[in-house]
Design a protein with these regions (language model features):
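Cysteine-centered motifs
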Residues: 19-22
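Leucine-biased recognition of intrinsically disordered, low-complexity hydrophobic segments
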Residues: 4-12, 30, 35
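Catalytic NTP-binding/metal-coordinating core of nucleotidyl cyclase/transferase enzymes
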Residues: 31-117
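Acidic, metal-dependent phosphodiester-chemistry machinery of nucleic-acid enzymes
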Residues: 15
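Catalytic beta-strand-to-alpha-helix segment of the class III nucleotidyl cyclase homology domain
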Residues: 37-38, 79, 98-163
Length: 163
């Protein structure tokens, strides 16, 4: 078997040993991208991660009803609580969401408002049909990229939500 090492003047990844400096050099050959000097936007933020407890079970019992109720709860209770406390919904994932706040106090107040509203909403709903949110909040350094957030601050909030 022959091993190609070059296609014309374009170097192949196999021409470089696996090290960061070599990755930077290879990226420079491909298009002048300098990974070493690319700056990321980091900020301190309060990250709220939330999802619906027992969502798979609820969907298994009645998909259409669960989805309709979740959409209504988000529109009437959750989204307004986030907005009123200056939060920004970064993304939603089916039954979950990731929200960014500039203030930890605002994140906690928003979470308390959601939990209180949901408790009132669920008072007349049978236990096995309740939509209940698990919420985790963490303040930490996050990376902002294309209206999304990444990093340990996000990961820790998501882990806390699962507890």
């Amino acid at each position: 078997m022959t091993r190609l090492t070059h296609l014309g003047s374009l170097p192949l990844a196999q021409d470089y040993p696996p090290c960061f400096d070599c990755v930077v050099e290879f990226a420079d050959h491909l298009g002048g991208i300098s990974l070493a000097t690319e700056r990321v936007d980091r900020r301190l933020a309060a990250v709220l991660a939330a999802d619906v407890a027992g969502y798979s079970r609820l969907m298994g019992a009645n998909e259409e009803d669960t989805l309709a109720r979740l959409k209504a709860v988000r529109k009437i209770l959750v989204d307004p609580a986030i907005t009123s406390h200056r939060g920004r919904i970064v993304k939603t994932t089916g039954d979950g969401m990731l929200v960014e706040f500039a203030s930890a106090v605002d994140a906690v107040r928003s979470a308390i408002e959601v939990q209180r509203s949901m408790a009132e909403q669920n008072a007349a709903v049978p236990q096995d049909q309740r939509i209940e949110f698990r919420i985790g909040i963490h303040v930490g350094d996050v990376i902002f990229d294309d209206n999304d957030i990444f990093g340990d601050g996000v990961n820790i909030a998501a882990r806390l939500e699962g507890i």
